[in-house]
Amino acid sequence: MVMRLGNTFEKIYDVVREIPVGRVATYGQVALLAGNPRWARVVGYALHVNPDPDGIPCYRVVNRSGRVSPAFAFGGENRQIALLEAEGVRVTDAYVDLKKYQWQPDLR
């Protein structure tokens, strides 16, 4: 079980590493790209225990409404907002406009 969970986390981290600067993805989107659309909560947990916050940009993941995490594990909501804004992502009242900033990976 631990090995399976480890492999799941690695898939999640691989997807999150692909989110470009200036873009965000939702937990559900990361779950789908990692192989299972039902993993949205697993994505949240994996990012909460992210072993490499500098190399795995978990701050680029928001909820399905575009809301940043009120409990961002690496400095709180204001830190997540600051990191996103430093990349040019506008955050208004803790929300990102998904129509403008959501990552649309080429799935070919």
Can you describe what each PLM-predicted range is?
Residues 2-108:
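Nucleic acid-binding interface residues in structured DNA/RNA-binding domains
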